[in-house]
Each structure stands twice: as C-alpha cells, then as structure tokens.
Amino acid sequence: NYWLCDNRFVYQENKPYPHIVFEDFLPLDIANLISNEYPNLNAETEHYKVRNHEYVDRYFLEDTTKFTTSIQLFSNAVNSRSFLLFLETLTGIKSLLPDPYFMGGGAMITKQGGHLNIHVDFNWNQKLQLWRRCNVLFYLTQNWKEEYKGNLELWSKDGKKKVQDIIPLFNRVVIFNTTSTSYHGQPSPTLCPKDVMRHVFSAFY
C-alpha cells in the first residue's frame, strides 16, 4: 500500500514529534451521522465530566453506554483489529492495544471561551497497566470556521515553543505519538458562537 507507506514516512519525519493530519478521513455520510448524533451537552450534561479551572475548560464523556448506537459502533470501530493494524503500520509502533474505557478521552466538547493549556498526557494507564503510545483525535463539528480559533497546537519537546497550529476542521483527524515530551493543547480560547461547540472524539492506544 503505497499510500500508507508514504504517510508512514511523513508521520515519522513530522516535527516536533511524530504526527500526521488527515483531511476527510471518514466517509462523509458516516462523519455527518456521528456529528449529528454527537452527545448533546444540554440534554446530557449529567453524563459528562467537567474540567473547569485555569488549565482546562471542557466537557468529556468516557462512558460509551451513554452514546447513541451509531457512536457506539464508531467507538468499536476505532478499537477494532483493522484500525489497530492501520495505526501500527502508520506509526511503526507494534502490538498496539486499544483503551476500551476511553480514559481521558471519548466524546469531548469545548464551548465558547473553552481552552486546554499546553500539556503532556499521562502516559501510564493505571487501569490497563499499560503505557500509552498513541492518540487519535477525530474533529466532528460541521462548518467549523478558522475564526472560531480553538486550534490544536503542537509544541517543541521542551514545551517552550509552538511548532504546529492545526485548525479543528470537520472530518479532520490528527494522530500523534504519546510520550513524556509530546506537548500539545488548545490554549487559545474558542471564539465560536454560543450555539456552536468544538467536538472532538479522542482515542488512546
């Protein structure tokens, strides 16, 4: 598969650490379905965990039983054998395993003014007793505009300098290695209208 081989090279060579950005990653009908059925913050706030302090302001939902059937099937797909084999070939990391609990991941929502300071994710998954190696982010807000800000930023390995700035456009996917130096975040508060929210589904491996 020349496409995958080419992208594996791109992944390994990208700075500040191995990562890649894919456009129109999911079939459009599936991306639209997931976006339209994304857990509603107003109706299901009681299911979301809330992080709201100086470092982060966002909602996240790890419990897949609270998802619609379509999003449950999607969450199963991102943990499937075929997707794991794709990730292993792309990243060069062998024997990847999914996190079926979506600890620190799952469905995430950032409202107007929300942010996430530059950080590194915890690398040790206590529940699975395994090291995290890779993170996949699926951006799922239809008609997201550049002026809404809320970009994903990848910073240098010493955490002192921004290197990449990625707009969370609809059906864009970002994959990157999870290490003790993979600094990233969304430090710029979202400027979206109150009726628009930044949706991202996060999976760790």
Q: At which residue positions do the language-model features occur?
A:
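Proline-centered turn/helix-capping motifs that create local helix->coil transitions or kinks
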Residues: 42-44, 94-97, 142-146
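Conserved strand-loop elements at the edges of beta-sheets that form or border functional pockets
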Residues: 24, 109, 168
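Non-heme Fe(II)/2-oxoglutarate
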Residues: 4, 8-91
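Catalytic core of Fe(II)/2-oxoglutarate
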Residues: 113, 121-134, 141-205
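Non-heme Fe(II) oxygenase catalytic core, chiefly the N-lobe of the double-stranded beta-helix
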Residues: 36-39, 66, 75-132
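A structural signal for short, well-ordered beta-strand segments and their strand-loop junctions
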Residues: 21, 97-100, 106, 175-176, ...
